[in-house]
Amino acid sequence: RNDQAKREEWKVTLDTENRDRSYLFGRLLAVLEQAEAATYGKEDRRETNALRRLTRYTQQPMHTARALYEKLNPYLNRLMRNKPGLYRQYRALFDQLFGLLDELEHTSLNEPLEDVYLLGYSSQRSALFTKQEQNETNTDGGNTDE
């Protein structure tokens, strides 16, 4: 088994072509986490619902994702009012990821995740931070001109 793990290669950057169930759930976890965190103020250091339920998420990913998504509604409403571009970005990611998960065998959706979910989580989170930094740079540049 170790030989197989050594031969298996995973991209550190976001792999949007990867259809591995655990990888996709890792990506979804990052989006659930960051959509909520995007509504926090700079001084707000509380843990997101997604991180509080991380252990359960890895054991029952689909049930936990549904519960987290339902809890996310007030945060998404806040994003829609205050940061509509970011709201659209997260909505598109949710649609994409739920669509990809829907293509998988439904009986496997709630089985425990393999460790590769961490790669999906980390790469999606990194991609979101990069995009957010680019948007903030563009916004800051625009605000100084006005």
PLM feature spans:
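Intrinsic-disorder/low-complexity detector
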Residues: 1-146
